[in-house]
UniProtKB/Swiss-Prot annotation:
Gene name linked to the record: rsmG
Protein name per its UniProtKB record: Ribosomal RNA small subunit methyltransferase G
Location relative to the cell: Cytoplasm
One cellular component (GO) term of this entry: cytosol
Protein role: Specifically methylates the N7 position of guanine in position 527 of 16S rRNA.
Source organism per UniProt: Alcanivorax borkumensis (strain ATCC 700651 / DSM 11573 / NCIMB 13689 / SK2)
InterPro entries in UniProt: rRNA_ssu_MeTfrase_G, SAM-dependent_MTases_sf
Lineage: Bacteria, Pseudomonadati, Pseudomonadota, Gammaproteobacteria, Oceanospirillales
Catalyzed reactions: guanosine(527) in 16S rRNA + S-adenosyl-L-methionine = N(7)-methylguanosine(527) in 16S rRNA + S-adenosyl-L-homocysteine
Keywords: Cytoplasm, Methyltransferase, rRNA processing, S-adenosyl-L-methionine, Transferase
Amino acid sequence: MSLSSTLTQGIDALGLSLSDDQQRLLLAYVDLLVKWNQAYNLTAIRDPQEMVTRHLLDSLAVLAYLEEGDTLDVGTGAGIPGVILAVARPQQAFVLLDSNGKKTRFVRQARRELGLDNVEVVHGRVEQYRKAPSQIICRAFASLSDMLALMTPIMTDNTRLLAMKAASTEEELATLPAQWQGRHHTLTVPGLDEPRTLVVVNKA
């Protein structure tokens, strides 16, 4: 199956509506990622078909839970999920933060080539970031408690944290400090026969 067909069928299965131009931009991002990945090792996934499933569709699966408002992608890496969500939500502002200069250089190039005026790329650590966003999204890089400890300084009473995790998080939710409340949502990613969970946390 072509990359375009895999993407289109996946978008339909997720119940989303993305224009031909948006889908073209997403495939252009995959092309760019494949090209840069040969020299810079941005992702362990090498196969473009897998990139469509594990990067594009995996990121788009959270779109239904993404509210309006400025969004900070912490540890964006090669721009996942931030670039993908920014293509899907062109009217929404995204800040993509990562401490790896090699990866932020790639994301800046992707921003230019894809014409993503709604994206700002920041090279730095979340501990030094000071602007409180409406919501924070990330592919989980630590336990929920550890992530919250890092992000508490930029979370207001209304800020939501959306953590994309591979496995069930019920035990982690049960051990959250009292000032936090969380819900987990099981995600189905078309073409991926692996568990995916989105945890949404905010102040109680």
